[in-house]
């Protein structure tokens, strides 16, 4: 047991230092790092982003007392913040080792954050995690991860509270997703703790109050350890399982009530089905007989495929003639023939971060699209690619930029896109 405990603590400590590497598989030894010391933080950054680090340090000092008050903390140890722009990753993470790593300079930040700045939103979110870890920590003899394992705090609580205390409910966080899960009757199967965590935390606070959240997380048993399920039952009067069911009913009632006030899609116009069932983006060619799509060709596909589907009108006409002949013999009306498509894959990978996207040239000879790749110094980034339909040749148009959302001009002579160097 002593050997197992030692190995567990050592392994956990090593994992705490590999978060950024696990995202990209690269360590970036070419970077030179510096540190800014504030009253309560050590802010680490590499060359080229000092202004961003200074801004982040200021934000951190401003949000710290608010986060502590929200969680009922009187004291908080010194924390470490790491800023990097080396990879195009719209994310950040925090660890129980009291440090957070945040990727800055992100193209999709405006879509994700709405009317707030990426730095304020993501930094406040990750610092709330660190405050949370310090709120639920156990006695000295139960270090991480033993304390966390025993506490049994659900992932939705960890992520949901960070969103509840530092963010606003918005389309990408997670109104659009909730609507999809409600329509598909999969609200109870949401796997991302960020997703259901936000709405569950909003529901928890609305039903029981912010003070109850603090009481749940501050409660300790005789061994000075947090038992989340027992604490939840003690301070809310209901079991966690019942809370989850109440939340599910509440979400369904809210979103179906919202949907009942809107017109049906069929009332707006005729609905057409695309050739791919698992489709993320599409654009028709001008002749409307072809459509370019980004999606999955089969269930369980790990990446996405860029395909062009072409209608086989010859087969459709042939089948239509057969149906007409049969219908005439029986004196019936012939049934419509469903569109028949030939699908051809041209590329595969990731074609956008928040939104997969592509654009077909006005002359139908090429397609432009973003694709995730390794750039200079093996940095992860999106670049704009041009695909020739006939030649099948793929050309990288932005070798020195992080670029996304390409669109042809009406005459096809120019391309506009979002980018930074």
Predicted regions and their residues:
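Beta-strand-rich domains and repeat architectures in extracellular enzymes and scaffolds
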Residues: 270-307
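A flexible loop/linker signature enriched in serine peptidases of the S9 family
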Residues: 175, 294-308, 312-330, 348-355, ...
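Blade/loop signatures of beta-propeller domains
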Residues: 248-267, 328-337
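Sec-dependent N-terminal signal peptides
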Residues: 4-13
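Juxtacatalytic substrate-recognition/specificity segment
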Residues: 21-148, 154, 227, 352
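A short beta-strand motif characteristic of beta-propeller blades
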Residues: 267-274, 342-349, 392-398
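Blade-terminus and WD-like Trp-Asp/Gly-His loop motifs, strongest in beta-propeller folds
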Residues: 282-290, 358-366, 406-414
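Active-site-proximal alpha-helical
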Residues: 67, 153-175, 179-238
